């Protein structure tokens, strides 16, 4: 389920129920949408849903692989992990040089938001842009459904990470 595309949220929400030995556990999976490209858009004060941007190293030539493309590029039919020469010549776009340190900083800041809601032992980081949270013991504490809790976290990420960077000059 995509959440709040109209305000530029960059998160895919997945709520997973997992039954273990007759005990139901509820996990949230937050997968940051086209993370590298979205970070590059935010850093440039651009909306990832309305910006044509690819993350690639052009010094490697037209055969360079795009590490990420913005959601807008995907809507135009451009495939993630394509090569530069595979992007239709009619599509105008911004090329962002990969900045792994910057992506790690954003990921760490987002992890800090997760820690506002969950103990670290209930957060299972899968990759730089995806984490699973065992929400089982927190739903009652926060008096929320899994979807409500996930949406609350997403709003926090949007306001703390995205909005603060977007309006920072």
List where the protein language model places each region.
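Intrinsic-disorder-associated, low-complexity terminal segments enriched in Asp/Asn/His/Tyr and depleted
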Residues: 4-5
């Amino acid at each position: 389920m995509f959440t709040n595309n109209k305000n530029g949220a960059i998160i895919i929400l997945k709520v997973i129920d997992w039954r273990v030995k007759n005990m139901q556990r509820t996990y949230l999976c937050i997968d940051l949408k086209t993370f590298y490209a979205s970070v590059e858009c935010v850093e440039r004060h651009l909306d990832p849903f309305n910006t044509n941007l690819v993350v690639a190293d052009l010094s490697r030539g037209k055969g360079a692989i795009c590490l990420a493309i913005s959601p807008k590029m995907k809507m135009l039919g451009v495939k993630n992990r394509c090569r530069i020469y595979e992007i239709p010549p009619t599509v105008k776009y911004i090329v962002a040089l990969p900045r792994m340190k910057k992506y790690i900083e954003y990921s760490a800041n987002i992890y800090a938001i997760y820690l506002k809601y969950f103990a670290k032992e209930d957060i299972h980081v899968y990759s730089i842009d995806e984490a699973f949270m065992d929400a089982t013991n927190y739903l009652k504490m926060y008096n929320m459904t899994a979807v409500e809790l996930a949406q609350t976290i997403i709003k926090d990420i949007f306001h703390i990470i995205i909005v603060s960077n977007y309006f920072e000059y």
